[in-house]
Amino acid sequence: MNRIVLAGLLLILALPAAAGPDAPGCFTRTYDRAHLAQHPDQVVTAVTLRIYRPPPANADKYWFLAQFRLRGKDKPLRTSGICNETASGLRCLVECDGGGVDVVPRARDATMHLDRISGPACDEDSAQELTGGKDDRLFRLDRVNDAACAGMKR
């Protein structure tokens, strides 16, 4: 009986946690010319993603800041919002129907799935929008030192 309980406990511990302690952090990826040449339909040239816990009053959620550098654009798309835990990670949403991303954070990296995301512009018509195209849907981001996200603003 003890072996069965121990085996069950080990199986549970081996499963990936929804968000867990690996969620907060800074994740980034810059695509080099060679990668972009192999993926001519990829619009995103760089991604920075910060996931963090807000002040204690909202400690049951994660918040996020994201910045996307895009081919042919001088200004990056910047956005932010709230993340809810899911069975596989986090669902991060931008207010005012600004879309969102699904993020699976891990100790050394994160996977980000993009359908559609825009800058926060509840009352503006000029919000930038990024739609996950052929080569802009799935991103593997490297976990980096939090200092890489220090300049990001909400």
Predicted feature descriptions by range:
Residues 2-8:
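Sec-dependent signal peptide recognition
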Residues 14-17:
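N-terminal signal peptide c-region/cleavage motif recognized by signal peptidases
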Residues 21-59:
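Short, solvent-exposed loop/hinge segments that bridge or flank secondary-structure elements
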Residues 21-22, 47-51, 78, 87, ...:
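Disulfide-bonded cysteine motifs in exported proteins
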Residues 25-27, 82-84, 91-97, 121-123, ...:
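Sequence contexts marking disulfide-bonded cysteines in secreted/extracellular proteins
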Residues 32, 59-116:
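Contiguous, well-ordered beta-strand patches that form the walls/edges
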Residues 106-154:
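Glycine-rich, aromatic-bearing surface loops/beta-hairpins
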